[in-house]
Each structure stands twice: as C-alpha cells, then as structure tokens.
C-alpha cells in the first residue's frame, strides 16, 4: 500500500480527518482555528483536475450524459457552515442549485460516488480553499450602485434594505418609499448580480399606505425614528405584516419622544420583529434598547461600526450620527441627540452578547453608519476579540474553535435568511439551495475573496493582469466575472412579498431576475436563530449605562489592535 504523509496530503488534497482527529486551519491572522469534523471524500479515490490528474475520460470523468451529471463540481473543499458544519467534501452544482455534498467522480470506476462528473461538468479546484455560503446583508442603504461591487468582493451575495440613491431620506433610512420608487429601484437593481429585496417605508399609521407598498413588491417594511417610530405606526405596520407574511425591521425612538422602551415593546404585542442595531449607537431607545435582545419575539441584530469594540469606536461615531441623520453640530439639541446614542458600556456589552448567542444577526448599515464591505470581516474580528478576552466557548478547547466559528458564521448567513423568509433558497451550504458560494484562501478568509459563485457561476474573482499570458501576474485584483454580465443576471433573485406576485404592475416591470416570494416570516422567533438563541434577562443601569444579563455585569476592554486589518490593505 502506498502511503503519504499527513502534511503532504493536506498540500495536495486539502485538510482531512485521520483516526478521528481533524486537521486544523487558521482563519486569516486571527486566533480562530477550524478543525475538520468529517471528510466525505475517500482516501485514494479523490478527484482532482489537471495534467496527469484524475478527472479525465474513463477515470474520474464518466461517459454519462448531462442529465446525470453535475454542471459544476468544487473538489476537495473545506466547508464552513452553521448548518452543515466544518466538513471536507466535493460540492456538486446543477441548474444553479447545490445538488450534492459528498464524493464526486465516476461511478463506473470508483466506489462511493454521490456526485457524477461527466463531459458536461466544469471543475473548480477547492483543494486548500474554504467554501462558505454567501453573506446576507439585511441593512443596506441603497445609496450608490458601486456598493454592490464592494459587497461582492467581500463575499456578500444577498442585499436587503431600502433607498433610492443619495436622497436625504435614503442617506438616513433603509426604506424605498412608495410604489413608484419601489418599481424604479427593482428595475435599477435588475442589472446587478446579487439577490435583492426592498423594504417599504413602515412609519405610518395608515393601513392602506403600508399595504400598497407591499403590493408593489416590498419584501418587508422598515420603521425608522426619522420618519416616526411611534406605538401607532408600530402596531399598524405589524398588522400589515401579519396579513401579508412579511418581516418588519425597526429603528426605534432614541429620544423617547413617543414613549419609552417599554411602550415600544408593548406595541409589538408579542409579534415578530427584526430589531436593527439593537445595542443603540445606530439608533433606538436611549439607553436601554439593548434589552430587546432578551425578548423571544425580537430578532436582534448589530450593524458593523460598533463591532468589535476598539479604542477608536467611540470617537468615530459622533460624526457618523451627525452626518447620517441630517443633524447640525451648531444646534445644542442636535448634538445632545447624537451624544445620547454613544455609550461605551452598551457597546462593550454588545461584543459579549454576540459571543454568548444573545445577538443573532450581523449587518452593515451601508454608507449610513456602516461599511458594506466589512460585514464578514468585522464578524470574525469580534470572534477573535472574544476568544482573546474570554477564552474558549463551551464545547471548544485550546485546540479548536468550531462552536464559536459556527455561531459567528450563522450571524450573516442562515439567521438573516430565516428572519426574512428566504432560508428555503439561501443562507447555508445545503442541498437544494442556490449555489451562492464564496471561496476563500485561508490566509485571506473574511478579508478578500478568491471567487464568488452566484447560482454556480463566477461573478467576482481575484484575477491578475488581463493582458498577461496567464491569469496570475500582478496586479491581482477582485474583478467582475462573466456571471455579472448579460442575461446571466438571471442567476440572481429579487425577493418580494407573496401578494405582489399577483399584482400586474409588478409582472409588467420586465425584470430579468427571478421573482421569489418570502415566506414564513411571521412564525419566526428568537428560538429559530441558529446557534444564537440565548434569551437572558437584560437590564441597563440608567445612571452608569452598565449592562447586566441574568444579573451578571457585562464588561470588556476596547482592543488597540485587530487582526484582518492593516497588513491586508497596504494596497
């Protein structure tokens, strides 16, 4: 029997499991170590493409017709996923969907084949690469279209939010107001290779004014204090949501003008709602909106500028608040409004509540107190900070951090998908879902993508000089690929409400994107948030702003230095 050393095997085929012990992979330059839990491939029967390799006719490639074979296979990849786990496998893609996670090859010559390779199969070499589900950003201000290229370059494949461009309302609030703007933005977003969904303006006590936006194609409604986040508007908005099975997102009343946090909670009446930037620096009842993270009907999210807590976090927030919410620093009341939202104690507690699974979702708040290209990066910086300050999570050890890794990746993949009724199509690396997949070199994990697949077709990738003789010479840049051009845009989805699908005005928009209705939004609770469903009793001292969870004070220090930072961005 021919033998190969473990290190040599990993170099050729990627990490594996031997004798029940998995190889480990460091994520970027963090302290986080992922250990392979299972290897679906078979030793000695691995498939690999290239000169003198296995995927050749009569060897690893069968003579089967296209109907029996996958369109694309990713070979020997390390999957990191909140649902599937941390596993080594071949991934089959057929008709834009993940069709298999297992062992690829030729069943006529190899044992255990579950993914058939044929003449109609393209190969993506996954050896030594990490594969994750595309990130889902549920807090997008659609201010400028260039955000989408930035998002794709950092692994985001689904963008949900609102706006109409750099209008003053859109600079502050994530809502696309009214049927006319809804139609225009759906048509504008039709030319980009990402899944999209739009929020209508939910700040109204008029049932009809909200319903007409849902019928026009809104996949959800957004309540925002700048338009009014009153108990009446909250109740009306949730009534419409219950009737139409859509999600409601809320940015509550920082100034406590129309009531305190208890009044907002009472207006929920136990109904499901997605709470944006639940810590409060991004907006919400001062100083105690963070209490929402302990409610079973609230799906609590963070936006990325407060994550993780560093020595620069407090200083940068004041200017962000002033600009985003159209405030005047020469007006004392405006300055007091901004300062009321920025609290060192609640920002520090936010890191810990994420680590313990009380906060369930991460998002960006793009160009409106958040960075569209940093949702993935800041999630892992936070996980690193928490390991550094708090040690291993329960179930982890000094050897590996699988439980923490699966908890944190859920925050920008499966949990936002579940919250907004789109988990039947996106959010995890599972059979039957869209092949919206991101490939990473481990050293660049969470920072710079190797390749982004949209329904199995490359839409963004790190590619060298296009005038060179090969694809690798410098400058290597993340560039748009064929999947982002022409009618290949049909590989993306526009998520809308179910009631809008029967509206002739929506079907007459002539969209290339496939229209898919959100579903199951109203039955979701905090218990459905994968690996992030802790429900502590949270309290905030009104004088000191100190945060307690189940009676325990939550405190951590600001970091002065982070991984995944300057060493990756010299150019």
Swiss-Prot record:
Cofactor: how and how many bound: Binds 2 nickel ions per subunit.
Keyword Metal-binding carried by entry: yes
Statement: the UniProt record of this protein carries the keyword Metal-binding: yes
UniProt main location, coarse: cytoplasm
Pathway, per record: Nitrogen metabolism; urea degradation; CO(2) and NH(3) from urea (urease route): step 1/1
Sequence positions that bind Ni(2+) 2: 222, 251, 277
Subcellular location per the Swiss-Prot or TrEMBL entry: Cytoplasm
Domain of life, source organism: Bacteria
This protein's name: Urease subunit alpha
Assembly with partners or alone: Heterotrimer of UreA (gamma), UreB (beta) and UreC (alpha) subunits. Three heterotrimers associate to form the active enzyme.
Gene behind the chain: ureC
Protein EC: 3.5.1.5
């Amino acid at each position: 029997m021919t033998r190969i050393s473990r290190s040599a095997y990993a170099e050729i085929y990627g990490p594996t499991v031997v004798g029940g012990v998995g190889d480990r992979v460091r994520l970027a330059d963090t302290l986080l170590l992922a250990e392979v839990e299972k290897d679906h491939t078979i030793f000695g029967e691995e498939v690999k493409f290239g000169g003198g390799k296995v995927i050749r006719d009569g060897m690893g490639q069968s003579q089967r017709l296209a109907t029996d074979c996958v369109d694309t296979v990713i070979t020997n990849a390390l999957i990191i996923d909140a649902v599937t786990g941390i596993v080594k496998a071949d991934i089959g893609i057929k008709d834009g969907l993940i069709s298999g996670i297992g062992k690829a090859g030729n069943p006529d010559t190899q044992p255990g084949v579950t993914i058939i390779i044929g003449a109609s199969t393209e190969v993506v070499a996954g050896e030594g690469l990490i594969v994750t589900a595309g990130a889902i950003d549920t807090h997008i201000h659609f201010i400028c279209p260039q955000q989408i290229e930035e998002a794709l370059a950092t692994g985001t494949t689904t963008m949900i939010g609102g706006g109409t461009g750099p209008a003053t309302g859109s600079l502050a609030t994530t809502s696309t107001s009214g049927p006319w703007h809804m139609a225009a933005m759906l048509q504008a977003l039709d030319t980009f290779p990402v899944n999209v969904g739009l929020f209508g303006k939910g700040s109204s006590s008029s049932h009809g004014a909200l319903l007409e936006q849902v019928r026009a194609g809104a996949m959800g409604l957004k309540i925002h204090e700048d338009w009014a986040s009153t108990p009446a508007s909250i109740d009306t908005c949730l009534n419409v949501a219950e009737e139409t099975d859509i999600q409601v997102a809320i940015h509550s009343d920082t100034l406590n003008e129309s009531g305190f946090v208890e009044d907002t909670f009472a207006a929920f009446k136990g109904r499901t709602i997605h709470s944006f930037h639940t810590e409060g620096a991004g907006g919400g009842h001062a100083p105690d909106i963070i209490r929402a993270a302990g409610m079973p009907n609230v799906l609590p999210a963070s936006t990325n500028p407060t994550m993780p807590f560093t020595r620069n976090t407090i200083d940068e927030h004041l200017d962000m608040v002033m600009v985003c919410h159209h405030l005047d620093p020469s007006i004392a009341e405006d300055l007091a409004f901004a300062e009321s939202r920025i609290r060192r104690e609640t920002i520090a507690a936010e890191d810990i509540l994420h680590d313990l699974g009380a906060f369930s979702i991460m998002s960006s708040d793009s160009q409106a107190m958040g960075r569209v290209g940093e949702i993935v990066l800041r999630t892992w910086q936070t996980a690193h900070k928490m390991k550094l300050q708090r040690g291993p999570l329960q179930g982890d050890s000094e050897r590996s951090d699988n439980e923490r890794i699966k908890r944190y990746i859920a925050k920008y993949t499966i949990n936002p998908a579940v919250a907004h009724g789109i988990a039947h199509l996106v959010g995890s690396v599972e059979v039957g879902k869209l092949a919206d997949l991101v490939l990473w070199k481990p050293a660049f994990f969470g920072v710079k993508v190797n390749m982004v697949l949209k329904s199995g077709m490359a839409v963004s990738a790190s590619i060298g000089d296009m005038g060179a003789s090969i694809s690798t010479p410098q400058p290597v840049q993340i560039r748009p690929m064929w999947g982002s051009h022409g009618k290949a845009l049909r590989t993306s989805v526009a998520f809308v409400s179910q009631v809008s699908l029967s509206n002739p005005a929506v079907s007459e928009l002539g969209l290339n994107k496939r229209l898919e209705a959100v579903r199951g939004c109203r039955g979701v609770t905090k218990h459905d948030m994968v690996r992030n469903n802790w429900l502590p009793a949270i309290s905030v001292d009104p004088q000191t702003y100190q945060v307690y969870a189940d009676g325990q004070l939550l405190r951590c220090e600001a970091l002065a230095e982070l991984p995944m930072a300057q060493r990756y961005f010299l150019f």
